[in-house]
């Protein structure tokens, strides 16, 4: 029960706080609600951290509209205060910007610089000259920085949550090593690991030109043989990759990959594949790179000279069996998955700007500069500028946010909680950092995912697969209240539909943002009654129609994440009990365990991510079950991946989504857009993912950055498909003052 009174905030008091008046709103609420009390367990846990910080910070998170402020403005208050606050808000949401990939070879540098430690190694004869470690001049990756040329040295301090947090490193520190990659707007594929791509007029042949002189992090040259090895001996191995990715084919027909010469490879398809360049830029099985996708045998390239020794067909079964036994693995497949794991194996040759030297299964995950990285700035200085990245494990989300508030991280957005924004604002000067908001176009920063393949309890599973039941759930909870508590009122409550400006937006916000996504307990209760859930027990909870027992739903939720999924789940459960008479419990588990539960289809629901869905065709897993880890049903994703050979047969609407998705890759843009819009129409109507709120910085967009860091964008495109902050090319970050850029000892010196 929530106390009420003149100085008490209740859910009914919450109003939306406009972003342009955020500071004013927070200050007013700090004055109004110093005596705020809330006795619910979820709220108590959520603000537990605040108790050890200032009183103003403690109570500022519950912000409301300007009209809600009870205290009259002082007589001397300037009339232009709102305009002033708008300029303050501009500190947090800046202009979208980022570094540029230079493609005009006339601007490529002809002389080169390197970190002082590497120069010393060259002088000592323990490292080849910089010219020998970089690609030939015409094949360099040249980056035009946001601010200008940087300085070498220093450490980038970050936080991570443990061995399951590999995405932390994938985003910050892999380059990213995609085959192609997005420009800073997230719209245009550009050269990256591949120097360039030629596309035939009929859209069937894609010729990739590699960078002559590029080297793996151990100094061995990268050639087309590494790509062919990946295709034939890893991706083509049925034990390692039993199910081929849909993106390596079109219209159900797999493409053919071949080596043309030492620095040229080619994909050929039977049908036009107009979207293939975007596939190679995105976080897909082909485009996503070795560091991220290599652990599952995907990613388009792999170090042949290193990984061949672990493949029985190349090294011989007896030799590989001995290694498997000596290193304690059960199969060669699990052995090579470890050997090709960027986050776990320091010996792995890679193409990333930093390489793992102390793996992720330690309290500190440590990365060091790659002496053979192929990227330079406009003056020829080899990137990265910063020597080391040190990620320190935080046992939970509260500890990580406390460290960020205290200024212990240099650039961090991952795992930072939107509810702590008042404290970040208050402590900027003391912590020597600046706060940035990186908003995104996804309609649901977080969504309530329904497992349509749930069979642990067939009665409940059938309810979950009933669209009417999902519609009733969507009308059973107050999104506005969740928005105020977990988004500070800055999100857009409603369905999972992407922002109106998105290419694939299904239509007007007035229709698709609210469709099946407005709190309407009368409607919800009527639907539940019609579904045979009209009987209740003495406590007012609905009873199952099959056995007369109480209906109990369970939401699986990940702990220690960058949004308060557990708190959201608890509030949704509270609303289900209060407004529609359904008992709901929360199963709060660690991320890796939650992934295992999801993969086994043992969960009924998840409250989890929805970000990235605006990149529909390269990051579809938060829209429908495009894979076995979407949360919507692993068995359905397996059906999609195997073309119906394995898994669970989808409903007719979901099959239509599958068909549209596969067709879209081989049609011109206008037709692809139409297919994408229809996918969203079906997804919103079917409500596999029940939207909560989105289009905000809540998911990895609350960014704190040390004021001494250079080449920092005022706003960056925020999307997992672009591996933000990877889209801002963190290898261009540098420390402006000498106190922070002392040269760091490198393990290979």
Give the role of each language-model region.
Residues 211, 228, 339-345, 367, ...:
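Ligand-site clamp/hinge motif
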Residues 139, 348, 354, 358-365, ...:
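Detector for C-terminal structural segments
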Residues 188, 195-241, 266-268, 400-403, ...:
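Aromatic- and charge-enriched surface segment that lines or borders ligand/interaction sites
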Residues 246-333, 712:
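Surface-exposed binding/hinge segments that line
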Residues 59-62:
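C-terminal motif of bacterial Sec signal peptides marking the signal peptidase cleavage site
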Residues 64-72:
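Bacterial lipoprotein signal-peptidase II cleavage site
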Residues 114, 119-201, 232:
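N-terminal lobe/hinge region of extracytoplasmic solute-binding protein
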